[in-house]
């Protein structure tokens, strides 16, 4: 959700479900109990049940019967399991030749009972021994499996066991610290409702949309399914009435997301995966900008967001172009970045729209870019991130290539300045007022920087628990004042952190395929759209009756942390193997091209330089494929 409070033209009214029964506000508050009737009446006004024409949600709105169907299906499956077990028992008796119905003679009854008791005791003892042995074997196997991937002292005996125990204890302590009790919410439901009734809360809805109570009640409302491949991008128009999506099928779909139907479906004109498609602001939804893996930047001309005219290429990168950055109020200008390290500014009013702003370099070496964002408070400034650890801020008015490669200032976590393994930044985004800058690092955490701090300043906050490894994963602020941080994860979950406390307050299963890449908040409503490896767009709204329980959170973040640590340990060996292969290949090529007449074993200087530059490019490409493969 951006900071803008756009027009509500064409949008449905909000009304019917309760959104404010958070456990934090129910902590023994007697006053809240006495005023429960008032709260029920007020909260009914603040629900987020969205329908196309104000009708019942069952007539094309949000589905509300899923939980009942799930419960009934679970009961049916449970009854089927019970019947299956009874049939198996019956077959067991038939195969063993025993009789289900045995009637002893009168004189034999007591004797048989004693014999049966003895047999049962013997069989019971044997079964208990067998079960104990099986349990011990299973425990030993589990311990072996857990110990195998761990890196540590390889000695036998107590040293290895002590190391494993210390490692497990440290991991448990880390998980506990990340899932500790949440602080008291700043926005109080009872107080806010009371002030609203008195007329002293004119921005009630605006403030409520940034409240923790809404975020903790998010649940999946429906899926928008019309793509035949991964969906890489979703974007709301300025008024929030339309949603654009695109992906691997090269199609762009414009949705009426409230009525759950596409209003426009057209070919993008790209030849490879579309990475981003965005409506330009203040143009009546008539212009859509796109970029893709083929390096092209294209613009589609729409008429009232319901009729497609054509697309044209306005810029060409020499590598994949992952992100666009819009100027908040301009219907003509935007920025693009690509893996060729180039930043273009596009002005649709010019005959030649694209002009090169800067080529990102570090120590005279190009740095491929994955992300770009414009400062909403100062549109001359923009930030980029890519194939190294630095977030760079530029000012278009004073880019001097001779001074610090034109960089105004750059940030990175201090522990990553001289790290032993390559680090990538997959997404950078400014807060609603441009004072903060959020950066998501590949195989690391999410860091918050103060954009007004001096060059090289340390991060101010750090958000942990998710995993960012396999794709170019996005991150975003959520809330009218950027109160929350939201990100997808390789584990298929969506994580919400409260920015002030850096703690996880919401944890949602967002993908069947395992990765969520793009998260787009609505401009002013408490609605979130997301996409990833699944072939659909998911719409989330805060319509759950109670706050979502963070069931399984500790297990998931523990697994994410363990997998990340394992990858960091193995990365060095993989890189060394690649370098060994490259050196052997280089030596072989030199042997083949030796001058047999003179016996010289050295290349000319020009060929050596060219080979060196080629090796740098190859090394970068391999590292990119290993660490940060775009979807």
Curated annotation (Swiss-Prot):
WD repeats lie at residues 226-265, 269-310, 316-356, 364-404, 420-459, 467-507, 511-550. PROSITE patterns: WD_REPEATS_2, WD_REPEATS_REGION. Residues 1-91, 108-163, 594-631 are annotated as: Disordered. Residues 44-54 have a biased composition (Polar residues). Gene3D superfamilies: YVTN repeat-like/Quinoprotein amine dehydrogenase. The keyword Repeat applies. SMART domains: WD40. GO terms for cellular component: Cul4-RING E3 ubiquitin ligase complex; cytoplasm. InterPro entries: DCAF8 (IPR045151), WD40/YVTN_repeat-like_dom_sf (IPR015943), WD40_repeat_dom_sf (IPR036322), WD40_rpt (IPR001680). Residues 77-88, 108-147 have a biased composition (Acidic residues). Keywords: Repeat, WD repeat. Belongs to the WD repeat DCAF8 family. This is DDB1- and CUL4-associated factor 8-like protein 2. It comes from Homo sapiens (Human). The gene is DCAF8L2.
């Amino acid at each position: 959700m951006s900071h803008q409070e756009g027009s509500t033209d064409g949008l449905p009214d909000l009304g019917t479900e309760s959104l404010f029964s958070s456990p934090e506000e129910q902590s023994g508050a007697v006053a809240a109990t006495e005023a429960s009737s008032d709260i029920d009446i007020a909260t009914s006004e603040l629900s987020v049940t969205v329908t196309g024409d104000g009708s019942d949600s069952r007539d094309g709105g949000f589905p509300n019967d899923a939980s009942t169907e799930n419960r009934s299906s679970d009961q049916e499956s449970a009854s089927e399991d019970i019947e299956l077990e009874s049939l198996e028992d019956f077959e067991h008796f038939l195969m063993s030749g025993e009789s289900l119905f045995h009637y002893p003679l009168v004189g034999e009854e007591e004797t048989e009972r004693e014999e049966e008791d003895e047999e049962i005791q013997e069989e019971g003892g044997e079964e208990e021994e067998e079960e104990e042995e099986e349990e011990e074997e299973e425990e030993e196997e589990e311990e072996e499996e857990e110990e195998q991937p761990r890196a540590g002292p390889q000695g036998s005996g107590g040293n290895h066991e002590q190391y494993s125990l210390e490692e497990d204890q440290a991991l448990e302590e880390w998980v506990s610290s990340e899932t500790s009790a949440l602080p008291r919410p700043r926005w109080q439901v009872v107080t806010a409702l009371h002030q609203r009734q008195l007329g002293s809360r004119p921005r009630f809805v605006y403030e409520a949309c940034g409240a923790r109570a809404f975020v903790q009640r998010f649940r999946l409302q429906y899926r928008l399914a019309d793509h035949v491949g991964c969906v890489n991008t979703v974007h709301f128009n300025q008024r929030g009435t339309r949603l654009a999506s695109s992906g691997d099928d090269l199609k762009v779909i414009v949705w009426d997301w409230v009525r759950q139907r596409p209003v426009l479906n057209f070919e993008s004109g790209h030849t490879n995966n579309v990475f981003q498609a965005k409506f330009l602001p203040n143009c009546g939804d008539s212009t859509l900008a796109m970029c893709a893996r083929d390096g092209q930047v294209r613009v589609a001309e729409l008429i009232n967001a319901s009729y497609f005219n054509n697309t044209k290429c306005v810029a060409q990168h020499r590598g994949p172009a992952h992100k666009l950055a819009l100027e908040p109020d301009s219907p003509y200008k935007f920025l693009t970045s690509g893996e060729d390290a180039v930043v273009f500014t596009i002005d649709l009013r010019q005959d030649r729209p694209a002009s090169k702003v800067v080529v990102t370099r570090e120590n005279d070496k190009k740095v491929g870019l994955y992300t770009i964002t414009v400062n909403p408070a100062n549109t001359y400034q923009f930030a980029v991130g890519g194939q190294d650890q630095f977030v760079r801020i530029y000012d278009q008015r004073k880019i001097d290539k001779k001074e610090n490669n034109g960089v105004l200032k750059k940030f990175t976590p201090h522990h990553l300045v001289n790290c032993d393994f390559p680090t990538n930044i997959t997404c950078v985004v400014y807060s609603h007022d441009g004072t903060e800058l959020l950066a998501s690092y590949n195989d690391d955490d999410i860091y918050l920087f103060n954009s007004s701090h001096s060059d090289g300043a340390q991060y101010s906050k750090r958000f942990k628990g998710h995993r960012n490894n396999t794709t170019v994963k996005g991150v975003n602020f959520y809330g009218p004042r950027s109160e929350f941080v939201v990100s997808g994860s390789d584990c298929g979950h969506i994580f919400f952190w409260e920015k002030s406390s850096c703690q996880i307050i919401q944890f949602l299963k967002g993908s069947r395929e395992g990765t969520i890449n793009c998260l787009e908040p609505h401009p002013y409503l408490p609605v979130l759209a997301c996409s990833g490896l699944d072939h659909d767009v998911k719409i989330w709204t805060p319509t759950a009756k109670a706050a979502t329980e963070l069931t399984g959170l500790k297990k998931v973040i523990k697994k994410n942390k363990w997998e990340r640590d394992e990858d960091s340990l193995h990365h060095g060996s993989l890189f060394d193997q690649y370098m060994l292969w490259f050196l052997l290949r280089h030596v072989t090529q030199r042997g083949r091209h030796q001058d047999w007449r003179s016996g010289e074993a050295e290349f000319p200087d020009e060929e050596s330089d060219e080979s060196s530059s080629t090796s740098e490019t190859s090394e970068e490409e391999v590292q990119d494929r290993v660490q940060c493969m775009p979807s």
